[in-house]
UniProtKB/Swiss-Prot annotation:
Signal peptide: none annotated. It holds the Pfam family Cpn60_TCP1. ATP binds at T29, L30, G31, P32, D86, G87, T88, T89, T90, G413, N476, A477, A478, D492. Keywords: ATP-binding, Chaperone, Cytoplasm, Isomerase, Nucleotide-binding. It comes from Streptococcus mutans serotype c (strain ATCC 700610 / UA159). This is Chaperonin GroEL. The lineage of its organism: Bacteria, Bacillati, Bacillota, Bacilli, Lactobacillales. The gene is groEL. It is found in: Cytoplasm. GO terms for biological process: protein refolding. The keyword tRNA processing does not apply. InterPro entries: Chaperonin_Cpn60_CS (IPR018370), Cpn60/GroEL (IPR001844), Cpn60/GroEL/TCP-1 (IPR002423), GroEL-like_apical_dom_sf (IPR027409), GROEL-like_equatorial_sf (IPR027413), TCP-1-like_intermed_sf (IPR027410). One of its GO terms (cellular component) is cytoplasm. It catalyses: ATP + H2O + a folded polypeptide = ADP + phosphate + an unfolded polypeptide. Together with its co-chaperonin GroES, plays an essential role in assisting protein folding. The GroEL-GroES system forms a nano-cage that allows encapsulation of the non-native substrate proteins and provides a physical environment optimized to promote and accelerate protein folding.
């Protein structure tokens, strides 16, 4: 395919147009008075959301060069979401600010490599200062505040804090759709382990790339499955029940994996295969935990059991299993309560006699997975559109809360970024590196400027007053008052703010140092088909 190529200022300006289109669409959602964006879906009702990464992923531009710029910013939002789970709109706003001001300097003759060096130094200093002013998060009330700020809903904050209280900060919390209009919290027995599906073709939801299995059987073994004949009799038995199957094995390879995938694609059989968690003796113990939880038997040579002789009676069962590319969650295993309790007591006794901290830590992880359960937030709403929007807000709140517990919190509403300006400004840099530092100084103001604008205030006035206020004092855009942000519950997780700044600076620097852009040449449109001749006009030809 032929390529179109642009160079220097022409290349950068084309990409920046794409950056601006995407950022201008996303940044209207920032802050307590941010607006929503309506996304057209190819099927079903439109999605109304204020989630930055969801909006960014939907944007495709007709111009290939502009689209590349938009996609780079979308990558900033996605990466920030992957690392911190929130802060995607802030990351987008920061990227646009650095790129926009940086382009002016590069066009005026500044060296982009020097600018990049200054940006990196300034961002590193800002991140260090954010960590230094962070406050730890503890207690149900603080957790509820973080979740409430992220979701813009005190009710959501209560659900998230209650869920984390019941299953622990590192516990498994899932979000489901409720059949009613009310949102409620359930805690059900379950287990999560860090192994995902062996093939992406096993997913049942192509949009979220997850496999949801309702009422599945579980084959649990420490053997490697390479020959499909070893499990064929068992597969035929399960197929008759019309229920899905989760295979947990040492590995599934050879002819076995493509055969399972082919049957899944054809719709013959709903099956998902994952590798067994852990290694060595710890793997055997974890498989036994899963077997006890689900009422199954581990198919292992230690017990003299072979795959080819396995019957459906040896399989575990669960109400639901969810598998993504990285993890598996088993909910409501069918194992007896007494058997689970005995297993829990066994692990507790092993913890007491463990001689190394490492062994004790791993045993405590197993205990948490076996006894902690899974908290399920069931989201209810009046319409499907509201339901989708509510789920996205709760997901953001959950991610932000975990980030806050991990690295602490700072004053929210962009205040913390203003508070670190003094440290960044004090950096002794020269020439183009100083220009890069100044770009970051300007960008650090941008989230506050946009939050104020969305709330109907003049951003420059707010920023000027912020710079002359004591650290932690900020502007509450929801009601127009000046408050101590942390006391008022307007807080951001350090991990979210830090990730947004680091990812924005990284991609913005790459755009500024771009000298050539290569894009596919648009394919010519196919000629329109000639209109069919009216049969009545053929009379003279007969």
């Amino acid at each position: 395919m032929a390529k179109d190529i642009k160079f220097s200022a022409d290349a950068r300006s084309s990409m920046v147009r794409g950056v601006d289109i995407l950022a201008d669409t996303v940044k209207v959602t920032l802050g307590p008075k941010g607006r929503n964006v309506v996304l057209e879906k190819s099927f079903g009702s439109p999605l109304i959301t204020n989630d930055g990464v969801t909006i960014a992923k939907e944007i495709e531009l007709e111009d290939h060069f502009e689209n590349m710029g938009a996609k780079l910013v979308s990558e900033v939002a996605s990466k920030t979401n992957d690392i911190a789970g929130d802060g995607t709109t802030t990351a987008t706003v920061l990227t646009q600010a650095i790129v926009r001001e940086g382009l002016k300097n590069v066009t005026a003759g500044a060296n982009p490599i020097g600018i990049r060096r200054g940006i990196e130094t300034a961002v590193a200093t800002a991140v260090d200062e954010l960590k230094a002013i962070a406050q730890p998060v503890s207690g149900k009330e603080a957790i509820a505040q973080v979740a409430a700020v992220s979701s813009r809903s005190e009710k959501v904050g209560e659900y998230v804090s209650e869920a984390m209280e019941k299953v622990g900060n590192d516990g498994v919390i899932t979000i489901e759709e409720s059949r009613g209009m009310e949102t409620e919290l359930d805690v059900v027995e379950g287990m999560q382990f860090d192994r995902g599906y062996l093939s992406q073709y096993m997913v049942t939801d192509n949009e979220k790339m997850v496999a949801d299995l309702e009422n599945p059987y579980l084959l649990i073994t420490d053997k490697k499955i390479s020959n499909i004949q070893d499990v064929l009799p068992l597969l035929e038995e399960v197929l008759k029940t019309n229920r899905p199957l989760l295979i947990i094995a040492d590995d599934v390879d050879g002819e076995a994996l493509p055969t399972l995938v082919l049957n899944k694609i054809r719709g013959t059989f709903n099956v998902v295969a994952v590798k067994a968690p852990g290694f060595g003796d710890r793997r055997k113990a974890m498989l036994e935990d899963i077997a006890v939880l689900t009422g199954g038997t581990v198919i292992t040579e230690d017990l003299g059991l072979e795959l080819k002789d396995t019957t459906i009676d040896a399989l575990g069962q669960a109400a639901r299993v969810t598998v993504d590319k990285d993890s598996t969650v088993i909910v409501e295993g069918s194992g007896g309560k007494e058997a689970v309790a005995n297993r829990v007591n066994l692990i507790k006794s092993q913890i007491e006699t463990a001689t190394s901290d490492f062994d004790r830590e791993k045993l405590q992880e197993r205990l948490a997975k076996l006894s902690g359960g899974v908290a399920v937030i069931k989201v209810g709403a009046a319409t499907e559109t509201e339901l989708k929007e509510m789920k996205l807000r709760i997901e953001d709140a959950l991610n932000a809360t975990r980030a806050a517990v991990e690295e602490g919190i700072v004053a929210g509403g962009g205040t913390a970024l203003i508070n670190v300006i003094e440290k960044v400004a004090a950096l002794d840099l020269t020439d183009d590196a100083a220009t890069g530092r100044n770009l970051v100084l300007r960008a650090l103001e941008e989230p506050v400027r946009q939050i104020a604008k969305n709330a109907g205030y003049e951003g420059s006035v707010i920023i000027d007053k912020l710079k002359n206020s004591s650290a932690g004092t900020g502007f509450n855009a929801a009601n127009g008052e000046w408050v101590d942000m942390i006391d008022a519950g307007i807080i951001d997780p350090v991990k979210v703010t830090r990730s947004a700044l680091q990812n924005a600076a990284s991609v913005a620097s790459l755009i500024l140092t771009t000298e050539a852009v290569v894009a596919d040449h648009p394919a010519p449109e196919a000629p329109a088909a000639a209109p069919a001749m009216d049969p009545s006009m053929m009379g003279g030809m007969m």
